[in-house]
């Protein structure tokens, strides 16, 4: 085994001391750096093959920035990101291109993430075309199969995004993410813009797809109740740092950090006595 090959037991994704700082600049004639925003400040976590790691925190906690740094959509300030044992931090877009087949992303806003000028068939099929996986009638067949698999119809192939509801648009985004048969899917707040009833449908769909395709998820959300439902393990992020990490049951039933307890207390619970117990961490 060479240095770039990972053992079967190695994590699919291993993030160590990931840092992303944004400079604050001021000046009249010449900008100079006066401070930094520490959006991600020494974050470490692993995602195993076929599992879901939930990354939870309020808006501004740094979780989405961390995901973009993992995918090299923004350049990390420092730290290590290994995918299947290979260091990918600092790789250029050309070097990352083959890895895009293995690492895909589902975005938060199903309205903004789909090009309104393109038909659904183009949106879902573009990754297949760019990577040279399929073309012509074979491309159409694969896209239509994906649409059916995510709960849409093959007849939706020629429609435009504005003809769909928010939940249906997110299904289109999921189909696009799965088109290249990735090993890791980063789900960046994939249900936060949807109604509660639709959220449950999308989460259940993601569960089913994980079982069918052996996917690993990094599932990002601010609602720890949703995160607990889908995750094997949870990492809680606050002010750019991970403050608590463990199994989903351990983090939600026996939280140690005050910030985790705060997130749990915000989850709607029918019995107010249970809510008080959660606040106390009991």
Task: Label each region the model flagged.
Residues 87, 138-155, 264-265:
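Conserved ABC ATPase "signature" region
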Residues 2-11, 24-32, 36, 247-282:
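Short catalytic/signature loops enriched in Gly
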Residues 29-34, 88-104, 130, 137, ...:
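ABC ATPase NBD coupling module
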Residues 160-164, 168:
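Conserved ABC ATPase signature
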Residues 179-183:
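A short, proline-enriched helix->beta-strand linker immediately N-terminal to the Walker B motif
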Residues 79-87:
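Conserved ABC transporter NBD signature motif
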């Amino acid at each position: 085994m060479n240095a770039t090959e990972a053992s079967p037991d190695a994590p699919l994704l291993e993030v160590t001391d990931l840092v992303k700082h944004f400079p604050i600049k001021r000046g009249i004639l010449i900008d100079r750096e006066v401070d930094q925003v520490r959006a991600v400040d020494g974050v470490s976590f692993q995602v195993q093959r076929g599992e879901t790691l939930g990354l939870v925190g309020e808006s501004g906690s740094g979780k989405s920035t961390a995901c973009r740094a993992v995918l090299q959509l923004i350049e990390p300030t420092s730290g290590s990101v290994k995918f299947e044992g290979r260091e990918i931090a600092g790789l250029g877009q050309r070097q990352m291109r083959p890895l895009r087949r293995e690492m895909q992303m589902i975005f938060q806003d199903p309205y903004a993430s789909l090009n309104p000028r393109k038909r659904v068939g183009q949106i879902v099929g573009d990754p297949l075309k760019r990577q040279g996986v399929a073309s012509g009638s074979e491309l159409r067949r694969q896209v239509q199969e994906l649409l059916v698999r995510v709960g849409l119809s093959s007849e939706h192939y020629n429609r435009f995004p504005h003809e769909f509801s928010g939940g249906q648009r997110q299904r289109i985004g999921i189909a696009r993410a799965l088109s290249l048969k990735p090993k890791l899917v980063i789900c960046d707040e994939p249900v936060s813009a949807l109604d509660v009833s639709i959220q449950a449908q999308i989460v259940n769909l993601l569960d089913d797809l994980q079982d069918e395709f052996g996917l690993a998820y990094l599932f990002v959300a601010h609602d720890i109740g949703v995160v607990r439902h889908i995750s094997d393990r949870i990492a809680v992020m606050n002010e750019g740092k991970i403050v608590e990490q463990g199994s989903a049951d351990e983090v939600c039933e026996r939280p140690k950090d005050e910030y985790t307890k705060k997130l749990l207390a915000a989850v709607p619970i029918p019995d107010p006595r249970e809510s008080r117990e959660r606040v106390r961490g009991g």
